[in-house]
């Protein structure tokens, strides 16, 4: 049984090297091209999806639209959930990662970006960026809305959704595409592969490259691989890893 994870194409704030989190930033022109390329790769490998799952953030939604349009699958059911949103970066959202590395040091920024259980500085409850002011989360209990999240927090909301909605669809024989974000995908991979906290620090998910997982009936990994040119994928992974370094 296969499932395809797709991190959205490059966003405008990815391009500007800013912490994005739950900020609803759109794709850059390069991100649109990455989504189109992802669709081409999936078509070339013969993928045809029956259902898709997506976050409620437009960079993932637009990536999914582009992919389904290019694959002539716009008609399939799409389920959107905030539980697939990017990790919430709290008060760091909107700030430049390299500038933060200069101010606080690369090690601190790496901990904020890639550690498992360290939470970045939280938003104040009256901060207009707090999700309680966003209409898309109006129906959710206030205590479920984060002011900041660690990867552990992200895993605790994504894994139940995987168990309740996504994996049952895979188990039923449906061909599933998940359009999400670097950290929500990292959280799911940590769960699927039973990765240690140390191992997850080094996992970097590039934008726009389909990641295929072959699973057994218990949801354990049998194999996984990216679609695309391996050299380009490695370069993209290195770019993700370098985002928290102080620029010279």
Swiss-Prot record:
It catalyses: (2R)-2-phosphoglycerate = (2R)-3-phosphoglycerate. Substrate binds at residues 7-14, 20-21, 59, 86-89, 97, 113-114, 182-183. It is an enzyme of class 5 (isomerase). Its EC number is 5.4.2.11. Coiled coil: none annotated. GO terms for biological process: gluconeogenesis; glycolytic process. Pathway: Carbohydrate degradation; glycolysis; pyruvate from D-glyceraldehyde 3-phosphate: step 3/5. InterPro entries: His_Pase_superF_clade-1, His_PPase_superfam, Phosphogly_mut1. The keyword Isomerase applies. Keywords: Gluconeogenesis, Glycolysis, Isomerase. The active site is at residues 8, 86. The record marks 181 as: Transition state stabilizer. GO terms for molecular function: phosphoglycerate mutase activity. CDD domains: HP_PGM_like (cd07067). Belongs to the phosphoglycerate mutase family. BPG-dependent PGAM subfamily. NCBIfam families: pgm_1, PRK14115.1. Catalyzes the interconversion of 2-phosphoglycerate and 3-phosphoglycerate. This is 2,3-bisphosphoglycerate-dependent phosphoglycerate mutase. It comes from Methylacidiphilum infernorum (isolate V4) (Methylokorus infernorum (strain V4)).
